[in-house]
Amino acid sequence: MQEADSTNTFLKGMKNCDDDTIVVAVADYQTAGRGQGAHTWESEPGKNLLFSMLMTPTWVPVRQQFLLSEAGALAVKEALDTYTDGITLKWPNDVYWNDKKISGTLIETSIDSKGIKRCIFGIGVNINQMEFHSDAPNPVSLAQILGHEVDRDEV
């Protein structure tokens, strides 16, 4: 979609999916992208990867739900490793390059007596944004690292 307030919020309005189904929402721009707590996620229109996944991971024990955010961070790290060295993880869910944040993950789970009822897994990856204006302390994009823009769809 071109624009959403937040891809996580968009998926919150959907019904649960089957155990083997993942619903993905991708936006070119988020008017109210969120991070952990009260933090916002700054992103210029059409510059970064902004997506969320809705799943019902009943196979993940509630006590191990942190594994979902770790798996997401590892997947982003592996994708970025193909472009540059120095990509590291700040557990449980942030991806850094030389102490600068290039990606963040926001996991929102619903749990009932049987386990994890649903999970919305939001990821923001700074791809082509060259300037950041928020009060985020240390953002960086892949384009800043490489010195040129890259195709978001390839990442």
Segments and roles (model prediction):
Residues 1-82, 149:
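N-terminal lobe of the biotin/lipoate ligase/transferase fold
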Residues 19-21, 91, 100:
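Short, basic and Ser/Thr-rich N-terminal targeting/leader segments
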Residues 27, 87-91:
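General beta-strand structural signal in soluble alpha/beta enzymes
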